[in-house]
Amino acid sequence: LWIDPKNPQRMIEGNDGGACVSFNGGASWASIYNQKTAQFYRLDVDNQHPYRVYGTQQDNTSISVPSASEWGAITLGDCSYPGTGESGFIAVHPQDPNIVYCGAIGSSPGGAGALQRYDHRTRQIRLVNVWPEESTGIAPKDMKYRFAWTFPLVFAPSDPKTLYAGGNRVFRSTDEGASWTAISPDLSLND
């Protein structure tokens, strides 16, 4: 929190989602959503022209920004939000740029370790979690599968229908996240 030494009514509060400004001593604050601030975790692009840039943000949603707009300047209205919560890895389907997978943490539906599939055509998000278990409050030793805050997510370069996700094991899906198979042993040294 910064308080202007010459005018204590002017304050700036910074957080990992952005910054909020008050001109009345904290009675009201400007939103973080009207300022160009963000902390990005990961970026990706799709293969269309014009292309879209995707980013996952700390304490905000993920965002998809087009590289061009019909009207010149790219506005917030041109953007879309392919994932919710505090997001980690993001992967755009290599053959269908309308399909985006986003690892989401925190306020995501499904809780910690959620994996979401977004369709630009319908603007709908569907949960495609690797393992349907809420991890909040469970000791790691009691969990069958464990995922980090931002777990890896990538399409196979040799097969665009194969998606991999990393937890204490590597998982593979060949049906758009409808089902997952563990394909590695426990990689965590039994933590």
Feature-to-residue mapping (PLM):
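Beta-propeller blade termini and top-face loops
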Residues: 1-191
